[in-house]
Amino acid sequence: MWELVGLLLLILAYFFWVKSKTPGAKLPRSLPSLPLVGSLPFLPRRGHMHVNFFKLQEKYGPIYSLRLGTTTTVIIGHYQLAREVLIKKGKEFSGRPQMVTQSLLSDQGKGVAFADAGSSWHLHRKLVFSTFSLFKDGQKLEKLICQEAKSLCDMMLAHDKESIDLSTPIFMSVTNIICAICFNISYEKNDPKLTAIKTFTEGIVDATGDRNLVDIFPWLTIFPNKGLEVIKGYAKVRNEVLTGIFEKCREKFDSQSISSLTDILIQAKMNSDNNNSCEGRDPDVFSDRHILATVGDIFGAGIETTTTVLKWILAFLVHNPEVKKKIQKEIDQYVGFSRTPTFNDRSHLLMLEATIREVLRIRPVAPMLIPHKANVDSSIGEFTVPKDTHVVVNLWALHHDENEWDQPDQFMPERFLDPTGSHLITPTQSYLPFGAGPRSCIGEALARQELFVFTALLLQRFDLDVSDDKQLPRLEGDPKVVFLIDPFKVKITVRQAWMDAQAEVST
């Protein structure tokens, strides 16, 4: 009896404590919450988290809160509120929560993806952007992308009229692009380095996708945790591989020939070491560990994401062969077979660009953006958001809002075209496939170029159809850190028009 009374008093004390933290403030409506465990007992046990959070909007509205352990998290499910968080008040919400698994992957908050807002994060992010600017000179980036896309096509020629899984070949080609950007290095497709990169990249994505209780209850790290050990293992492999490549790059470094992200970071370190006016700056901002964390983030953000979206594009085209034929008709008409499609062809290959945009809508790279953190006491809409509150934008909710999208669960590339089909449009602001603001995807421009050029080259040269076993790709997906797609095969057939054109050239 007395135990029950004590429990009730504890619960009441907890709720009064929560209310007393922000007296008089208008807070977002909250899920029920209990001491210590927070709202966990009241969250759906089954289904994908992004879908469950979307459904909770029916009861709690487009902004609501919940407690995970002792941490308050605000869920955003409407584009106006999302844009307020990401853009209008981007600096106020540019922080990153320091969770256990993310700290493991970021070497305690280094790099650009999981680092908290601050001068070190801002500087490293700025240097990554300068790397992409470096590759824009003389269309160097597009040449690199075309080279790897052609390499993929050459491999596929050997599998004419076969049904194969393109996951690994696509992964290897995309990885080589990232290796060139980060290290000015490319590998043969059977090189053990590429295999090692594939192992740790896929391993980290898979391991971090599972809900790990230590991110909610950090004190659980005192107990053995199989999930954490798996993440540590893959992070160790990643660090060893990248360190080995980095050391070789440092040996060959030439300040007169800056050609990669690593070169830019090494040069910045040298400049910082020689500059005595950088008072107040973290002395370790360009330590080897900081540099490797940033390079590791580019690998994590630039490989599995693009690879996965390319597979989603192929899957939806197999399901919708009429869309594939429309794209090929555009390619035949405006590009032909005498040259390689380029990113500049977007103004003519409208159905292709619309298809890419629709895939990014219906299966966003990350259904929920990486959590943000309020750096100061702030507000979202009419609601108060105290400092250190975690904020999660549910991109799935934005991209599947029936008030903004007609039949949001249907694959309809034409929604991104005007009624005449002659101009690309953005039908609503409820579309943020790469996020926005200070924490937007740092490789958005690269990803858009890769998706367009790879898909254009593939459809210029091949028909990609349902596999011989007539098993269509599953479209449900597996939402980890990246929205993965289940393995599937496509039947590859070299297009007769392409073969005829090559025969003419050879004669």
UniProtKB/Swiss-Prot annotation:
In Pfam terms, one family for this protein is p450
Which PANTHER family does the record match to this protein? STEROID 17-ALPHA-HYDROXYLASE/17,20 LYASE (PTHR24289), STEROID 17-ALPHA-HYDROXYLASE_17,20 LYASE (PTHR24289:SF13)
Q: Which GO biological process annotations does it have?
A: adrenal gland development; androgen biosynthetic process; biphenyl metabolic process; cellular response to antibiotic; cellular response to gonadotropin stimulus; cellular response to lipopolysaccharide; glucocorticoid biosynthetic process; hippocampus development
Please state the pathway this protein functions in, per its UniProt record.
Steroid hormone biosynthesis; Steroid biosynthesis; glucocorticoid biosynthesis
Give binding positions for heme: C441
What is the protein's name according to its record?
Steroid 17-alpha-hydroxylase/17,20 lyase
Q: Which CDD domains match?
A: CYP17A1
- GO terms of molecular function: heme binding; iron ion binding; lyase activity; steroid 17-alpha-monooxygenase activity
SUPFAM superfamilies membership: Cytochrome P450
> Per the entry, what modulates this protein's activity?
Regulated predominantly by intracellular cAMP levels. The 17,20-lyase activity is stimulated by cytochrome b5, which acts as an allosteric effector increasing the Vmax of the lyase activity.
Q: What does this protein do?
A: A cytochrome P450 monooxygenase involved in corticoid and androgen biosynthesis. Catalyzes 17-alpha hydroxylation of C21 steroids, which is common for both pathways. A second oxidative step, required only for androgen synthesis, involves an acyl-carbon cleavage. The 17-alpha hydroxy intermediates, as part of adrenal glucocorticoids biosynthesis pathway, are precursors of cortisol.
Q: Which residues cross the membrane?
A: none
EC category: oxidoreductase
Residue stretches in coiled coil? none
The cellular component terms of Gene Ontology attached to this UniProt record, alphabetical and capped at eight, are: axon; cell projection; endoplasmic reticulum; endoplasmic reticulum membrane; neuronal cell body
EC assignment: 1.14.14.19, 1.14.14.32
Reaction(s) the record says it catalyses: a C21-steroid + reduced [NADPH--hemoprotein reductase] + O2 = a 17alpha-hydroxy-C21-steroid + oxidized [NADPH--hemoprotein reductase] + H2O + H(+); progesterone + reduced [NADPH--hemoprotein reductase] + O2 = 17alpha-hydroxyprogesterone + oxidized [NADPH--hemoprotein reductase] + H2O + H(+); pregnenolone + reduced [NADPH--hemoprotein reductase] + O2 = 17alpha-hydroxypregnenolone + oxidized [NADPH--hemoprotein reductase] + H2O + H(+); 17alpha-hydroxyprogesterone + reduced [NADPH--hemoprotein reductase] + O2 = androst-4-ene-3,17-dione + acetate + oxidized [NADPH--hemoprotein reductase] + H2O + 2 H(+)
**Required co-factor?**
heme
* Swiss-Prot/TrEMBL keywords: Endoplasmic reticulum, Heme, Iron, Lipid metabolism, Lyase, Membrane, Metal-binding, Microsome, Monooxygenase, Oxidoreductase, Steroidogenesis
Q: Which organism is it from?
A: Rattus norvegicus (Rat)
What the record says about family reads:
Belongs to the cytochrome P450 family.
Q: Where in the cell is it found?
A: Endoplasmic reticulum membrane; Microsome membrane
